[in-house]
């Protein structure tokens, strides 16, 4: 989804949560200043014409992995990377706003996993801490107006951003595992994010 299509949804999200567009733009500028190389061509190559599996970090992920097509291009939403690692799987890309980042992310990135790092108004300290430590491929994203080398393919939370990115970059099919949009054991903010994940994924034809 290009930004002109995404922008109306973004403003709805800002209003729903009371988030600051100015803070998002500040974070995007910070991330732009920390990007040393844009790995978007590599990410686009992974997606184009491929079968992509996006793994969310819901508790159901471990059960869902019994159906994982290991020949697919595997994307992890943030801490889902830890679950995949326990099963000996290194994802092709991790989509993260860094709130679930650990040193495992550094090791995966060094081994070739693309870190798709997202900037928003609440994660400036995490951007400053983690970005200089990544030695492998990185793609930078924002939920607001894109900048040179800071992209916006649509989507809001880590999981749905991964789906939107795969779709925009030409994946042939996208399978979703580890998404539980009806999880009752979440706080109100997370519940709102699940509401928006369902609403946004429906734009791409996913009934979750």
Could you say what each language-model-derived stretch is?
Residues 78-79, 192:
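Short beta->alpha linker loops
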Residues 90-91, 169-187:
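Glycine-rich phosphate/pyrophosphate-binding loops
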Residues 51-58, 73-75:
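Short, hydrophobic/glycine-enriched beta-strand segments
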Residues 54-56, 118, 141, 176-178:
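Short beta-strand segments
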Residues 59-61, 81-82, 158, 181:
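Short, flexible micro-motifs
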Residues 1-52, 62-64, 179, 184-208:
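N-terminal donor/sugar-recognition subdomains of glycan-related enzymes
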Residues 58-69:
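Short, contiguous, helix-prone interaction/anchoring segments in small proteins
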Residues 34-37, 44-46, 72-73, 79-171:
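Acidic/Gly/His-enriched mid-domain segments of enzyme catalytic cores or analogous surface patches
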């Amino acid at each position: 989804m290009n930004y002109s299509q995404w922008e109306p949804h973004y403003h709805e999200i800002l209003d729903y949560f009371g988030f600051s567009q100015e803070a998002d733009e500040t974070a995007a500028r910070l991330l732009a200043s920390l990007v040393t190389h844009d790995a978007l061509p590599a990410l686009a190559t992974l997606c184009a014409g491929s079968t992509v599996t996006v793994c969310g970090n819901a508790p159901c992920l471990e059960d869902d992995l019994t159906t994982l097509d290991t020949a697919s291009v595997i994307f992890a939403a943030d801490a889902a990377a830890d679950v995949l690692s326990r099963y000996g799987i290194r994802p092709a890309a991790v989509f993260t706003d860094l709130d679930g980042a650990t040193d495992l992310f550094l090791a995966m990135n060094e081994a070739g996993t693309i870190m798709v790092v997202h900037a928003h108004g609440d994660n400036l300290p995490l951007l400053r801490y983690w970005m200089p430590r990544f030695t492998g491929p990185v793609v930078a994203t924002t939920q607001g107006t894109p900048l040179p080398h800071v992209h916006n393919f649509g989507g809001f939370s880590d999981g749905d951003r991964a789906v939107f990115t795969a779709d925009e970059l030409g994946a042939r099919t996208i399978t979703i595992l580890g998404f539980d949009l009806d999880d009752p054991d979440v706080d109100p903010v997370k519940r709102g994010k699940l509401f928006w994940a369902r609403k946004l994924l429906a734009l791409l034809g996913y009934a979750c």
